[in-house]
Amino acid sequence: MMKKTDYITTEDFSKEELLKLVDLSLKIKACIKNGYYPPLLEHKSLGMIFQQTSTRTRVSFETAMSQLGGHAQYLAPGQIQLGGHETIEDTSTVLSRLDDILMARVERHQSVVDLARCASIPVINGMSDYNHPTQELGDLCTMIEHLPAGKKLEDCKVVFVGDATQVCFSLALITTKMGMEFVHFGPKGFQLNDMHKEKLDKICERSGGKYTVTDNEDAIEGADFLYTDVWYGLYEAELSEEERMQIFFPKYQVDSQMMAKAGADCKFMHCLPATRGEEITDEVMDGPHSICFDEAENRLTSIRGLLVYLLRDYREKNPYDLVKQEKAKEELETFLKPE
C-alpha cells in the first residue's frame, strides 16, 4: 500500500508540488468553464467535520465533490465531538472505513493533526487556529491568474495589512515558499510573532524569498498585491468594535489612498468575509483593482485540484484485485437475477 498524503500545512509540500497542484486546479477549471465536468471523483465520498461555521469552505468542498462526480457529507458543529464522547482515534478509524477522504475545520490545530495521524485516508485541514492552507492554494491560483505583465511569481511583492490572523501567516508561508517578497504591515502587538518568523526564516533560506514585519506604511510601496483580513482573531476573545478602531483605524484601513501608495497596478485581495467600513472601504472592494471575488471563486478551483491530487490511487493495486472484483460482480448479478 502506498503512503497516503495529508494536507495539513503547506510546510509539508515543496514549491514544485504546490505549483503542480495549482496547475492541475487551473486545468480542471478550464475544462469546467468550457462545459466539461471530468468525473475524476466518481464514487468518492468526502466527510466534512466542522467545529466552526463556514460559508466558502463548506460550499467549495461540496460543490467540488459534486462537479467531479463525488459526494460530500456535512458534519455540523455539535454533531461530532472530536476527542469528546468518542476519541479522535475512534472517530478517525470509523470515518476511514466510511469515506475516501476527510476535511476538518477545527478550533485547535492539534485536533486535525491527531485526526490525520489516526486516519488511514487523506485528511485536509479546512482551517485551524494555526493556519488556513486551503485559502493559501486559492490565493496562489489567484495571484498566478493576475500576474503583472512581464513579471514572474518570484518577482512579485505581496503586502498584508492589519492583524496577524491565520490567513496572514498562511499567506506568508505560501509567498515566501514561492520565492516572493512578503510584507506584514501591522501595529506592534498584532504582528507576526517569533514562532512565525522562525518558520519563515527556514523557508526563505531554501527558497530565496524574503519577508518584512513593520508598522512603517512606506513598506507598502511597490506592492503587486495588497491583502487584508478582519481586525480580530477568530480563536481569542474578540475585540470590541471600539477597541478595533482605536488600534487599527485609520492607519490600517485599505482605502484608495493606500492603494495609490502601493502602486497604480496593485491588485486588492481579501479572504472574506469582509467588514466593510473597517479594514476595507467599499470604493476599493468594489473597485477595478479588486480581485477578491475571483479569489473567492478560486477557493473552489483549488479545492477541486486538491481533492483530485490527494485521491490519486494511493492504494497500490494488488494483482488479484481484478479477479476478486469480477468474482464479486458475478455473485451479485447472480443474486439479483429474477427467479
From Swiss-Prot:
The keyword Endoplasmic reticulum does not apply. Its EC number is 2.1.3.6. Gene3D superfamilies: Aspartate/ornithine carbamoyltransferase. Coiled coil: none annotated. GO terms for molecular function: amino acid binding; ornithine carbamoyltransferase activity; putrescine carbamoyltransferase activity. One of its GO terms (cellular component) is cytoplasm. It holds the Pfam family OTCace_N. It is an enzyme of class 2 (transferase). It is found in: Cytoplasm. InterPro entries: Asp/Orn_carbamoyltranf_P-bd, Asp/Orn_carbamoylTrfase, Asp/Orn_carbamoylTrfase_sf, Asp_carbamoyltransf_Asp/Orn-bd, Orn/put_carbamltrans, PtcA. Putrescine binds at H270, C271, L272, P273. Catalyzes the phosphorolysis of N-carbamoylputrescine to form carbamoyl phosphate and putrescine. Is involved in the degradation pathway of the polyamine agmatine. NCBIfam families: orni_carb_tr, PRK00779.1, putr_carbamoyl. This is Putrescine carbamoyltransferase.
